[in-house]
Amino acid sequence: MRFLSTRGQTPPLGFSDAVATGLAPDGGLYLPESLPDLTGDLPRLAALDYPALCADFLARFATDIPPDTLRALVAASYPRFTHPDIAPLRTLRPGLHVLELFHGPTLAFKDFALQLLGELYGHQCRVRREAINVLGATSGDTGAAAIHGLLGRPGTAIFILYPYGRVSPLQERQMACTGAANVHALAIDGTFDDAQTALKEILDRKSVV
């Protein structure tokens, strides 16, 4: 599977290279060249638990990573979730169901993606024998989830900008009080938009990226 930039000005990449690169050099986002048709697989997929479903789905896009390796990465992504089903479906009454997405380490639904992304980054570090630095700006939950996805992970460092006094006390503690040497939570005097602007200016510097 190849991944193309939304701006169309950079060569396509495989899954692993797209993950390691992040933003495309032309400033676009990487999207898969095509989407698989899951229609015929829906009954089988519906019977899988969350890790098996995640590994099955990911294998359709991460075609440059062996299936056994993908399954191991997915299995390592969710032990910190506090419910054995990871995303339990609760029935409130007949015909009314609620999917619980708050059992991750930061209580945010973004833990589902960012715990897995941390494992994928760790895999890239081991395979490439190169360090990965992650830069981001947040208004709260994304930054905390990203930090906890990379918490203490060898070969990685994460730098998160957030507006001082404009995130919840819980989110600030989740970002600033981890004690992990590879985590750098940086409060700025300004708004979330100011944090994003500063991040874009940093990423535009070729000496940085």
Task: Walk through the language-model features, giving the residues of each.
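PLP-dependent amino-acid enzyme catalytic core
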Residues: 1-209
